């Protein structure tokens, strides 16, 4: 039985999203038990509205406080010690849950998770990773997405190790290729941190492809793309904005006149398939890698459909033993790097 603790109060919408998503998820996956963490009376009232809720696998964990989306990290971490967010992470720490998930304040969730669970040996900073759909029909894992604005070359190497472990565990890639996001493929491109990180990656046992550019994320050139949190967050928000704009433009164009409406009717099956491939809700659920527990961050504005996919990400991470694989991969590669062992980098993106 896979146990997932949910911060039911987090996000822009809270219970109207988390409870319906939890119920549908529990019905879809009978091998899961959900810990619903939050204000008990409010959760009980929300569950009472759904007669189809599998109550035998939905456990309410009472909390007396809620971390709001605009709470400073210090307030969430030091003052709200009985918050639904804090208790969800604590459930993993205590062994009562295998994973935890929140749609709440990203900075607070990262700080609380790191404080409660601590980082893995060999990891200085956790990183946020998610999947972005590409033209191959699969997805590219990208990290960091905002947890670490300023990074050293060593941090980028650690992100690459964790990203490769995530790709192996969840996406079932035997030896995932890793690319370093840069302004060009040439080894002379980039700032000093990126250049130094590239040298560390070339000397590591990872399957390092070389430098990649932003368009390579969507081409599926590599399995994992590594960058600092500042760049990664800009990439993520740009992708989300572009997807919404394209969807809006396509809708407007097909509604322009009778002919375009007719064309839209014929094109509807194709458009539906396209929508499913690029719908960012289907890729909701970023993993906070490098912690001693499986921690998932849902988008704050997620609806119940999107939050359900974040729950699926948590379930997949536990089922694929992501935590154990990440710890093992970090230990193995750290040992090999310290011993001076290296492999030849992939030359495709490693041009002069």
Swiss-Prot record:
Main location: cytoplasm
Alphabetical UniProt keywords: Cytoplasm, Lipid biosynthesis, Lipid metabolism, Phospholipid biosynthesis, Phospholipid metabolism, Transferase
Cellular component annotations (GO), alphabetically ordered: cytoplasm
GO molecular function, one term: phosphate:acyl-[acyl carrier protein] acyltransferase activity
Family statement drawn from the similarity comment of this UniProt entry: Belongs to the PlsX family.
Record function comment: Catalyzes the reversible formation of acyl-phosphate (acyl-PO(4)) from acyl-[acyl-carrier-protein] (acyl-ACP). This enzyme utilizes acyl-ACP as fatty acyl donor, but not acyl-CoA.
Subunit comment: Homodimer. Probably interacts with PlsY.
Protein name: Phosphate acyltransferase
